[in-house]
Amino acid sequence: MLKIIPNKKDIGAEIVCDLKKLSKVDFRRIKSALHKYGVIFFKKQNLTSSSYINFAKNFGKLANYPRLKGLSKKYPQITVVQRKSSDKGPSFGEQFHTDSIYTKKPPRFTMLLSKLVPKKGAANTEFCSQYLAFRNLPINIKKKLELVKGIYSSEGPISITTKERVKEKGKKIKELISTHKIFKKINLNYAIYCSPGHFMDFKPKIKHQLRLKKFLLKHQIKKKFQYSLEWEKNQLAIWDNRSMLHQATPFKGNRIMHRITIH
């Protein structure tokens, strides 16, 4: 029987079930929990690539990630995020961000399935609730941000963390730039939709925009909005890119994750 266990402050939830044996009612509950908590995770899920793909399709159309090659010709939508103990420099995604916001149609959801992880407590993924960030935003700041969009680039601050991985297993692409509204309405709730790792500027330009930019990017990642996920082998996490920021944490060791993004 499916069981939902919310984390403190309702930032994320663990769901206890077997992903290979789900009813239609179970799927509805999982989707509802994802919208409510922003990120959900499932332990002890020994999924094949085929079953992983089939599960992901329940959430929408699978996307192709523009910066890394797929797992294989059969599974191009699964990208491998790997770090070796010999790797130097920052981990892939080691700055708060939301995935592929620099595209015209960014993915709504991201899935990560752990295949190989270092010791417990290392290589966590940190999440930051943008529902809470929006609720705690001063009214005068909300009014200013309602009038502008954010400009985002694939060559933003976080791009330094992708260069080594792209060099190894990726493909060169031209800089991608897109603009999006700062706020998103998801069901009945609002969230800040701004990726610190890709943010370049506001459009149109506004008075005191540098000060506003610094305030916004600092506000979004306050500790009181955060949850740190400890990975175990064969653990699956799904998060809503519209309501959650995430980042990798620094670590040494070997890790292999299989990633899917969904429109």
Protein language model features and the residues they cover:
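Non-heme Fe(II) oxygenase catalytic core, chiefly the N-lobe of the double-stranded beta-helix
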Residues: L2-K233, R242-H263
